[in-house]
Regions:
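Bacterial N-terminal signal peptides that target proteins for export
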Residues: 1-9
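Active-site-adjacent loops and short helices of periplasmic peptidoglycan-processing enzymes
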Residues: 28, 32, 36-201, 205-214, ...
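Domain-terminus/edge residues, biased toward the C-terminal soluble/receptor-binding domains
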Residues: 181-185, 194-299
Length: 299
């Protein structure tokens, strides 16, 4: 009886030991499964990083100006555009057309012009350092209109045109049609009125046309000039900081800025990028440095 009971106990123990045993192959499999379970959090971290890498690879040009055109002037290829057909007030960009009309008339550049009461801005009340009675040559008036965006200088140029200011504005619109500007209308030679309108696409044509006038290229990119006004020297500076700063690294052939409250800030240029002439039009830029920042992003 004792032997039978002992034998049964030994068999039971052996049976339990067999059920709980693990072969070497089974142990290895179990360890691999455990390792996989521990590796899962690492794989999730790697997946979260992938979208960030894709965003960094994006080469889209993000510009803040409301309407933009960047065009290769040689081929005519539009390299970038944004709202290029939107018709907007163009402020002092107008003065490029003013200069072309003056030069097309082939009037004597050395002729003395006088700032009159009719040249004072009664629309916006802008200030000027050219007092009524100031006398300067036609070329100096052109310089101040293009470089320093002097409104009285631009107005005086129109009043000293054959037929007066009305004939001058008519000539501006005739010139616009002649160079293929479909969205462009002029009502004054300064750009102070919001009735002077154009599109970024049209302005690429206007800047390109202006670039064929050597004097416009010279005067619009003059950094600064001191003139005798009323018997005392006054320093005038270019309104485009990229022209004034050699450290900017820009090679600019034509430049004009503009601003009116209704339409923000503007910048148009013909510049050399990668050894090619490129026309840049930036319209409706509201930040203080937005147009300059956009130009540098394009570069």
């Amino acid at each position: 009886k004792f032997k039978l009971t002992t034998l049964l106990a030994i068999c039971a123990a052996l049976s339990l030991g067999t059920l709980g045993a693990t072969t070497p192959a089974e142990a290895a499999t179990s360890n691999k499964q455990a390792a996989k379970r521990k590796a899962k959090p690492v794989s999730k971290v790697e997946k979260r990083s992938e979208p960030r890498a894709e965003a960094q690879d994006s080469d889209d040009l993000l510009l803040k100006s409301a309407a933009v055109v960047v065009q290769d002037q040689s081929s005519g290829e539009v390299l970038f555009e944004k709202n290029s057909d939107a018709v907007l007030p163009i402020a002092s960009i107008t003065k490029l057309m003013t200069a072309m009309v003056v030069l097309d008339a082939q009037l004597p550049l050395t002729e003395t012009l006088t700032i009159g009461g009719e040249d004072v801005d009664t629309l916006k009340g802008t200030r000027s350092r050219l007092k009524v009675g100031t006398q300067l040559s036609r070329e100096d008036m052109l310089l101040l209109a293009l470089m320093a965006s002097e409104n009285r200088a631009a107005s005086a140029l129109s009043h000293h045109y054959p037929g007066g200011a009305a004939a001058f504005i008519e000539a501006m619109n005739h010139k616009a049609a002649a160079i293929g500007l479909k969205d462009t209308r002029f009502s004054d030679p300064t750009g102070l009125t919001a009735a002077n309108v154009s599109s970024a696409r049209d302005l690429t044509k206007m800047v390109s046309a202006a670039s064929h006038y050597p004097l416009i290229r010279e005067l619009s990119t003059t950094s600064e000039r001191t003139m005798l006004v009323g018997g005392r020297p006054i320093a005038f500076h270019n309104t485009n900081t990229l022209v004034r700063s050699p450290a900017s690294g820009w090679e600019i052939a034509v430049s004009k800025t503009g601003y009116i409250r209704e339409a923000g800030k503007f910048l148009v240029m013909q510049a050399w990028l990668n050894n090619k002439p490129v026309v840049i039009v930036l319209l409706d830029s509201w930040g203080r440095l937005t147009r300059i920042g956009d130009a540098n992003r394009i570069k």
